[in-house]
Amino acid sequence: GSIEIFYAPFDYINPKAKFHDGSSITRKDVLFSLEIFQTKGTPNQKKTYGKVVSTEMVGVNGIKMNFINNEDKELPLIVAGFLPIIPEKYYSNIDVTKTFLDIPLGSGPYQIESLEPGRQIKYQRVKDYWAKDLPVHKGQYNFDQIIYDYYKDSTVLVEAFKVGDYDYRREYNAKRWFSEYNFDAVSNGDVVLNEMKNDRPSGMNALIFNSRKDIFSNPRVRY
């Protein structure tokens, strides 16, 4: 069987909702987005959004979604909260299965200002962001510009920290923690090392030995 459900924001699209070019977000954009991620999304997106078996427009600005069954009580929340709404007029002429570097048209509090593939991406705050006055967004999005720098690997990332390219780092590598944090900025106090116990469950962090190596052939070495 199927479960028919109305669930925000699909049963009601805020009339103020708009993309960065000023055009309104419509039900057609929502349905287009759903179809794109059902057919051309990642495997996980196809699996999740594929559970919406049919849709129909209801009322002035509503959308009714029929799900494959009512076993997954969280599914309507996932669809409502995580489905990216993309503009049909922009993406209908783009093959989303292929990589492209054009700055896309979005609707969020920030938009891409510039990008250098593999190096950096800059986001600029949208001054007239349509949802900035909603209670859920109060106190957020306070920076005019956000810059993400990309590093080739963890070694390069650590070296960038040592020379002051960024200010805060969480270290997960036990070997690196005990052997590489003796640089000048630590000695003169510019970098403060602090171990904090949080008592939260975390993933495994261990030293794994390859028992196929000759050095471990003697069982007494393994224990």
Stretches found by the model and what they are:
Residues 17-23, 92-93, 129-132, 212-221:
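Short helix-loop capping/hinge motifs at secondary-structure junctions, enriched
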Residues 54-57, 113-124, 149-213:
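Extracellular/periplasmic solute-recognition and catalytic clefts
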Residues 3-11, 30-33, 63-65, 108-111, ...:
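Short, well-ordered beta-strand elements
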Residues 26-35, 62-64, 108-109, 140-145, ...:
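Alpha-helical secondary-structure segments
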Residues 79-145, 155-156:
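Gly/Pro-rich hinge or "lid" segments in bacterial periplasmic/extracellular proteins
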